[in-house]
Amino acid sequence: MSKDPVPLKAVHHIEFWVGNAKQAAYFYRKAFGFDQVAYSGLETGNRDRASYVLEQGRIRMVFSTPLNSNNGISEHIKAHGDGVKDIAFHVDDAKKCYDACIDRGAKSARKPETLSDENGSVTKASIFTYGETLHSFISYNDYDGPFLPAVSYTHLTLPTIYSV
C-alpha cells in the first residue's frame, strides 16, 4: 500500500469572504453558539480587511470582509457573492504537502512561507482547487497563539448581551 502523499491531521479553519463579516460573525455567535476568539481590522493595523475568527469545539471559521473597494476580496464578492474562499488543513509539514500537490499538477496560490510573531511560528502554503477556492496547508513549528501569527489578531472578550 502506498503512503498518503498529503497526510491531513485536521481542518484548521474555513475562511468565508463576505460583504459584512461583523454581521456574519454575530449571527454565528448568537444562532449557533460560536465564540469569537480573535479579530483583525483597522484597530489592529490591518487596513485591507476585517476578519473575525470564531470557534466551537474543534470547528474554526473566519469571516473576512474588505475595508475598501479596491481589493481582491471586493472583486471576489462582486463576482461570486458571499462564500468559502479557503479550506485550510492542519498538517505536519506544509511545504511537503504543497510540493506533493504541485508535483501532481496543482496550481500554486501561495508558496510556502514562515509566519512568525511573539507566539511562535507556522508554515503556510496554498493551492487553487476549483475556481478561485483555495486549500491551504498549515504546519505549526512552535506556535501557541490564538489563530495565526503575523496577522495582528487580538483576543476579544465580548460582553454578554441581555434582552429585556
What spans do the regions from the language model cover?
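Vicinal oxygen chelate
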Residues: S2, L8-K9, E15-Y26, K30, ...
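Single conserved hydrophobic/aromatic residue that forms the stacking wall/gate
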Residues: H155-V164
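Intrinsic-disorder/low-complexity coil detector
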Residues: D4-V6, G145-L148, L158
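Short, compositionally biased segments
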Residues: A150-Y153
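C-terminal catalytic ATP-binding subdomain
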Residues: T123-N141, P146
